[in-house]
Amino acid sequence: MRLFFITIFTLLFSTQSFAAAMKMVGMKGKASEVTKTIRVNMYDNYYEPKTINVKKGETVRFIVENKGVLVHEFNIATMKMHKKHGPEMLDMMKNGILLPNKINKEKMKMMSKMNHKMAHSHSNSVLLEPKQKAELIWKFTSNAE
């Protein structure tokens, strides 16, 4: 279970200061404006590539695949946002929404009616079960690594 907590918290963000912090990171991008594509493979103990460099103004299509056996999240955020999101993810685990290898989508939908944070529907992140793939398009408003 400890491994699950470590891996699920690898890339996290917060919705509390979402709007203000997102201005520093960027915004949802448009497919018609994509300037490059980056494939991200999420394993249980690491992600590939290890680092990603982007420049201000770039619109990047991330093709993200969970190649591990645990649920993983990929998101674009500041370190401060990652730290604030940890308790939200823990709440999702405590409420039975996030299981080690599965997302209980019915419970997520039900719980999101009481707490919108439980919906986990953010344009800067994808939450994937093992073997799932997703795409995220993001326009960066500053240089980032």
Which residues make up each language-model segment?
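N-terminal edge beta-strand
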Residues: 30-60
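Beta-strand signatures of extracellular beta-sandwich domains
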Residues: 73-77
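Sec/Tat signal peptide C-region and signal peptidase I cleavage site
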Residues: 15-19
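Extracellular/periplasmic metallocenter environments
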Residues: 20-26, 42, 46, 61, ...
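Short edge-strand/loop segments of extracellular domains
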Residues: 78-84
